[in-house]
Structure formats: C-alpha cells, structure tokens
C-alpha cells in the first residue's frame, strides 16, 4: 500500500494505473475510520485499484463547528486501510488543497439549501469544492459514499452530472452498531449517558420505516411519531425531522417512491444524523 501526501505524486500514480487500463474505486473520508468506511472500501474492491483519501476539510466546517476537535488518528487509519486491501491512501494537507489566494468554489443553488444545508451554511460549498478537486486529482471510475450522508450523496451526484465528471457515484447502505445507532466518527464524543439517549434517533427511524411498511402515507403523522420518540429524551434537541423527495430534497405530504426520511439532532453538544429510504414502493 502506498501512503501519498503529494498531489503531484498522486496524479502520477493514477496516470500510470490508467495507462494500464486499471479501474479505480475511490472512498473519500475525513479519517477516524470505522466499519462504515470499511464497508465502502469493501465495495470499492470490485475495481482494480482502491484509493482512500483522508482530509479533514476546513472549508466544510462552519465557524462554530467542530473542525479543531474533530477526531483524528492517522496511524490507526493507515493501518486499517492496509489491513483492508487499500492500494493508496492519499493524505494531502490544506496548504496543497487550497493554495495561497485560492478563490474558486463549486456552489449549488437548489438542493443545498434544504436539510443539513439550511442548518450548516456553506457546508455543501466546501464539500463540492473539495470533492471536485479530489475527482480531478484521482480520476476515479466509481466513488463510494455512505447513505448516512444521504443529502451529500445527492448533492455530489448533481455536481457530477452538471460538471460532466466521467465517474459514477455509488451509494452504499448505512452501517449500524449492534444496538442500531448509525456508525459515525462523531459517536466518540458521546458520554455514556448521551450514548444511551442517542438510540432514540435510530429508534425513530425504525418506527418511521415500520409505519411506511404498514401503509401509512401521511408524512405529518410519521414525523409526529418520530418527534414523540425523540422528545422523550431530555438530552436530545431536534434539529430537523423531514420527509423529502430523494432527488430534489423538496418536502412531500404523502409517501411515494424514492422518499428520504431524515433526522438531525443534538445529543448534548454532538450533532448526529440518520435516515431511511423508501424505494421500490408500488
């Protein structure tokens, strides 16, 4: 496995792979890897080569968010990548990604102002800008992203289509702890009491899925049922609960096919997200 920190060197390695007609699967991460990331790596191994990038992107954090305290353990991350058959770990620093006088950004005017985008101003501009750069540097064939960041997946798919990137975005299922909590690097922030309270988030998701399976169509009733579960936990503050069209992120009144049910909530000071997809509904 190669551990690369230079943009120039990464581009040269990719150029060599491509000259031998090797396909590239790419997993973008901010590090502090967990089983959710490793499931993306496993999916990426269907390609000839697998690249994992580790970059805590300052551009996608707001002024009062957790950039400085975001969990980092590079040595552990590199070992996990090596143990799971990754071919290249790309770890650039911010000075390489954002040169002096950097002034070019990728912005979007529609789906980024909903859900997390409405709460985290500038977040998706940072995500799209850094991923556009990574796509240009690493020239992947397929990019593997987790459904837990569902809105991000949709936003990046739109960017790929709009800017004619020659790659495919593959969305992979949410990986959960044994008790149901969605795997997240931020789970490490939770105290023991907060960790117990956080289960209300996944429980609200599972209840909503059950209601849909039982035939409930009224989204206001589903949202209220989810809200009732979350409000029982005094350590939880709801950020949003929404049911939206998965492609447009527009709110809907009645359940149909291709609907995203999404929750964001603060457990203590930690913001967690979770979701479910309604697909194949007849």
UniProtKB/Swiss-Prot annotation:
Give the keywords, sorted.
Answer: ATP-binding, Cytoplasm, Ligase, Nucleotide-binding, Pantothenate biosynthesis
Q: Which reaction does it catalyse?
A: (R)-pantoate + beta-alanine + ATP = (R)-pantothenate + AMP + diphosphate + H(+)
**Residue sites binding ATP per the record:** 30-37, 146-149, 175, 183-186
The record's annotation in CDD domains points to: PanC (cd00560)
The main location class comes to cytoplasm
Q: Kindly list the GO molecular function terms attached to this UniProt entry.
A: ATP binding; pantoate-beta-alanine ligase activity
Catalytic site residues? 37
Compartment annotation? Cytoplasm
Instruction: List S-S links within the chain.
Output: none
The EC number(s) given in the record are 6.3.2.1
Pathway of action = Cofactor biosynthesis; (R)-pantothenate biosynthesis; (R)-pantothenate from (R)-pantoate and beta-alanine: step 1/1
InterPro entries annotated for this entry? Cyt_trans-like (IPR004821), Pantoate_ligase (IPR003721), Pantoate_ligase_C (IPR042176), Rossmann-like_a/b/a_fold (IPR014729)
The entry marks the following residues as binding beta-alanine, namely 60
* Gene Ontology CC terms: cytosol
* Residues holding (R)-pantoate: 60, 152
Enzyme class, broadest EC rank: ligase
What family does this chain come from, according to its entry? Belongs to the pantothenate synthetase family.
**What is the protein's quaternary organization?**
Homodimer.
Functional note: Catalyzes the condensation of pantoate with beta-alanine in an ATP-dependent reaction via a pantoyl-adenylate intermediate.
In its miscellaneous comment, the UniProt entry states: The reaction proceeds by a bi uni uni bi ping pong mechanism.
Q: Which PANTHER family match?
A: CYTIDYLATE KINASE/PANTOATE-BETA-ALANINE LIGASE, PANTOATE--BETA-ALANINE LIGASE
- Its protein name is Pantothenate synthetase
Source species of the chain: Campylobacter jejuni subsp. jejuni serotype O:23/36 (strain 81-176)
**Quick one: which gene encodes this?**
panC
């Amino acid at each position: 496995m190669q551990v690369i920190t230079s943009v120039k060197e990464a581009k040269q390695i990719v150029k060599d792979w491509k000259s031998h007609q090797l396909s590239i699967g790419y997993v973008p991460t901010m590090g502090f890897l967990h089983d959710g990331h490793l499931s993306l790596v496993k999916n990426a191994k269907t390609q000839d080569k697998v690249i994992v990038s580790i970059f805590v992107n300052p551009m996608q954090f707001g002024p009062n968010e957790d950039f400085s305290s975001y969990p980092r353990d590079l040595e552990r991350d590199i070992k996990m990548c090596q143990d799971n058959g990754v071919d290249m770990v790309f770890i650039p620093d911010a000075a390489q990604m954002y040169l002096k006088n950097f002034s070019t950004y990728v912005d979007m005017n529609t789906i980024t102002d909903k859900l997390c985008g409405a709460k985290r101003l500038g977040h998706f501009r940072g995500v799209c800008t850094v991923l556009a750069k990574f796509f240009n540097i690493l020239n992947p064939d397929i990019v593997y992203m987790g459904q837990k960041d569902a809105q991000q997946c949709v936003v990046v798919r739109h960017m790929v289509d709009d800017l004619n990137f020659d790659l495919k975005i593959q969305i992979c299922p949410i990986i959960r702890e044994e008790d149901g909590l969605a795997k997240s690097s931020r789970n490490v922030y939770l105290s023991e009491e907060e960790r117990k309270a956080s289960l209300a988030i996944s429980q609200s998701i599972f209840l909503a899925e059950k209601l849909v399976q039982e035939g409930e169509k009224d989204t206001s009733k589903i949202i209220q049922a989810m809200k009732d579960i979350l409000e029982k936990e005094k350590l939880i503050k709801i950020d949003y609960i929404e049911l939206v069209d998965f492609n447009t992120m527009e709110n809907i009144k009645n359940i149909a096919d291709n609907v995203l049910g999404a929750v964001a909530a603060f457990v203590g000071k930690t913001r967690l997200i979770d979701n479910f997809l309604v697909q194949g509904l007849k």
